[in-house]
Curated annotation (Swiss-Prot):
Its EC number is 3.1.3.-. The lineage of its organism: Eukaryota, Viridiplantae, Streptophyta, Embryophyta, Tracheophyta. Keywords: Acetylation, Hydrolase, Magnesium, Metal-binding. One of its GO terms (cellular component) is cytosol. Belongs to the HAD-like hydrolase superfamily. DOG/GPP family. This is Haloacid dehalogenase-like hydrolase domain-containing protein At2g33255. It comes from Arabidopsis thaliana (Mouse-ear cress).
Amino acid sequence: MTFLLSRTFISLTLRPSCSISMANLTTNAKTRLRGVVFDMDGTLTVPVIDFAAMYRAVLGEDAYKRIKAESPSGIDILHHIESWSPDKQQKAYEIIADYEKQGIDKLQIMPGTAELCGFLDSKKIKRGLITRNVQKAIDIFHQRFEVIFSPALGREFRPYKPNPDPLLHICSTWDIQPNEVMMVGDSLKDDIACGKRAGAFTCLLDETGRYGPDDFSVSGLQPDFKVDSLSKIQNLLETNFDLNP
């Protein structure tokens, strides 16, 4: 499947300081892109964590079914845990840590990641990382992949995705405006929401065709681009953006 340029690419709702002039759009001028920020689990790494099983273990079967029915776009387990008592939180985080450790033990780099990073390096485009996983997982990812993403923020950075603050922090660190950055991830409710709220371009990685128009309509979140493989992103960037340093 080739990349999808969404209708919102032309009518992006950005903060005033991040707006794109209609004059540029009508003359087909390409917008400058200076940085790409990636999600980690399911984007840079092959998805291996059984999130449904983890949610059941943390919430209990009845609560899991109820919350899932109330949240068709997905369960934000970290958000639910925040309101619990300290003892209950600790037990929940221990369960999550166990599942995440299993994921770390099975960590595999997503096909196309090395090639995409090489392309970004050749264009001097910065790359960062935002994950709701822990910093230890980021460190192991860096060790195994031997390519560094910087800044690389785990859930220790508060507030975490889908809040835009992690992405805005990276933009500030780079001294780059959000509308010169793209957020790439496999989660509509976390990655695309984070990017949209920050005023960045967004690209949804959807390998299995999980997301469709109904999901975008219900969530109110439409990515600017959608790809089924990281290998499609290089062509997407070259076609739609000015990549000159």
